[in-house]
Amino acid sequence: MTTTTLGTAIFLIFAGMAHANEIRVLSTQATEEAYRELVPQFEKASGHKVTTVFTGTLDANKRLAAGETYDLLIMSAPSIDEHIKDGKVVPGSRVDLARSGIGVGVKAGAPKPDIGTTDALKKTLLAAKSIGYSTGPSGVYMVGLFQRMGIADEIRHKLKQTPTGVFVGSIIASGEAEIGFQQVSELSHFAGVDYVGALPADIRQFTTFSSGIIAGAKTADAAKALVKFITAPAAAAAFKKRGMEPG
């Protein structure tokens, strides 16, 4: 953010906010890198303290079901909508932050397979010794894609699903998975992984990640200010650097 733009954003977002608060956030890992870049700027500008738990979709749902208390939730848009329906997120509070496609990675130094077309990807999957995928939205999509490709039965014994909260990049880097799939934002800069690219255009899928105010939030106004800060035009570069499209 430029000094001028940041100064304007601070004035518009924090004008009239007299007290600093602690904002408790439960967040998906897909937006983590961009979020970590932006939050310290927000804390410095606002005086608020942000405490964040980053985890996978399944674990986030378990935490909410167990009654853990937060002020702001960041998950996929469909998950936010579900939590609005079940009363855990305030209706009308959903704000879309950014969207991410699904990327492909292999262990650093390994030959990069051909994923340029759907047919090439299919051949690569059939030839791979092991295939990593997640429990999150990207994993759900990939399981459906394997079925639509007609290869689900042939590759089932090679599939390696990471536990919730564990990056697919970790099992690629360790060699447990020869090839792996996860959100571009989670995979493209993972240590020990060479990023191959996104899925072919005709089967490309995007997931929108959104925020929502938790019902009964103690610091709802401060949480809303955080959302305004990380969705301001000047914050877009932080998401773009991680392969995400803001908004």
Question: What name fits each language-model region?
Answer:
Residues 4-15:
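Bacterial N-terminal signal peptides
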Residues 1-5, 25:
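Low-complexity intrinsically disordered segments
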Residues 19-58, 62-66, 74-87, 91, ...:
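Exported/periplasmic ABC-transporter solute-binding proteins
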Residues 70:
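Dinucleotide-binding Rossmann-like beta1-alpha1 core, especially the glycine-rich loop
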